[in-house]
C-alpha cells in the first residue's frame, strides 16, 4: 500500500447476491452496498453516489445510481425507458458519470454493444463476398458508447462501426490506400488480438471489446479502451454534441468526421504506423 496510488478501491463479488465493497489499500472495508440486483461493475462517482451496471438474466441490461445508504436514486433499463431490447443494448464493463456542460446536468456514459448485419459490415468496409450465413456469429457484440441523461434519454452515441476504413479493395466502401493515412479510423481488416488464435481477419465476434471509458471535462473528450486493438483512443464529445433539444443531431455528428479518433496510443500496428508493442 505504501507504494500504491493513495485512495480507495471498489471490488465486486459478482453473481447472485453480489456486494460492492469500498476498501482502503490495507483491505479494510469502509462501506458496502448490496447490489440491486446482482451487480457486475461499480465506481464511486461523487461522495455517496455509486453508479452500477447490473445484469438481467444472462445479459447486462441496466444501470443505476445508489446513495451511501443503498437507496436507488436513478435507474435506466432500455426496454422500459427507451424501447430498445436488452439484446440490442446490453451494458458491459464500464459506466462513467459526467457533467455535461451543454445540458448543464449530470449524464452517464455507458459501454454497450449489439449484433450487426451483413449490410452494416459491408458499409463499414467488410468483404461483400462474405454471406450473412458465412459470417455466422462474427457480427455479434460490436461495441458502442451511449450517453444517458437523468431523464433517461439517449442524448449522444458513438459507434465504432461509423469510424472504419479498409485498404483491401478500392471498390469497397471506405477505401484508403494505407490505414496510416487515416489514423482517425479503425482498419476493418487488421487482425485484432481476438482474431489471432484462429487467423481470421475482418469482423469477428466481440470485435473491439471496450473495457473502460472515461471523460475529461476540461477538453470535453472521451477516452475509450478497445482491448482487442490494444489501444486507448480519444474522441471529441463536446464538438459532436451539437444540440440540446434534438439528440439525433448529436448522434449524426458523432457518426461523422468530427467523431473520428483525434488521438490514439498503444498499438501503432493497428493502423500500419509502426510495430506492435512488446507488451501486447
Regions found by a protein language model. Give the residues of each.
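Histidine-/acidic-rich catalytic cores in large beta-rich domains
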Residues: 1-280
Amino acid at each position: 500500500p505504501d507504494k500504491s496510488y493513495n485512495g480507495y478501491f471498489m471490488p465486486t463479488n459478482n453473481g447472485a447476491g453480489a456486494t460492492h465493497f469500498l476498501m482502503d489499500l490495507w483491505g479494510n472495508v469502509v462501506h458496502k452496498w448490496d447490489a440491486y440486483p446482482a451487480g457486475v461493475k461499480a465506481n464511486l462517482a461523487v461522495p455517496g453516489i455509486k453508479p452500477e451496471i447490473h445484469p438481467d438474466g444472462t445479459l447486462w441490461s441496466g444501470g443505476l445510481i445508489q446513495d451511501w445508504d443503498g437507496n436507488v436514486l436513478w435507474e435506466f433499463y432500455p426496454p422500459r425507458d427507451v424501447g430498445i431490447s436488452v439484446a440490442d443494448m446490453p451494458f458491459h464493463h464500464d459506466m462513467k458519470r459526467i457533467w455535461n456542460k451543454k445540458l448543464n446536468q449530470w449524464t452517464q456514459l455507458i459501454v454497450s454493444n449489439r449484433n450487426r448485419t451483413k449490410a452494416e459490415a459491408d458499409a463499414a468496409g467488410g468483404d461483400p463476398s462474405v454471406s450473412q450465413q458465412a459470417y455466422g456469429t462474427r457480427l455479434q457484440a460490436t461495441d458502442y458508447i451511449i450517453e444517458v441523461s437523468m431523464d433517461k434519454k439517449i442524448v449522444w452515441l458513438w459507434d465504432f462501426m461509423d469510424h472504419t476504413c479498409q485498404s483491401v479493395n478500392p471498390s469497397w466502401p471506405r477505401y484508403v490506400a494505407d490505414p496510416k493515412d487515416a489514423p482517425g479510423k479503425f482498419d476493418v481488416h487488421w487482425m485484432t488480438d481476438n482474431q489471432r488464435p484462429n487467423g481470421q481477419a475482418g469482423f469477428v465476434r466481440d470485435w473491439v471489446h471496450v473495457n473502460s471509458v472515461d471523460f475529461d471535462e476540461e477538453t470535453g473528450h472521451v477516452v475509450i479502451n478497445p482491448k482487442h486493438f490494444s489501444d486507448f483512443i480519444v474522441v471529441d464529445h463536446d464538438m459532436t454534441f451539437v444540440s440540446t433539444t434534438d439528440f439525433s443531431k448529436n448522434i449524426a455528428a458523432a457518426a461523422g468526421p468530427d467523431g473520428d479518433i483525434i488521438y490514439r496510443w498503444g498499438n501503432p500496428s493497428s493502423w500500419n504506423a509502426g510495430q506492435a508493442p512488446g507488451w501486447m
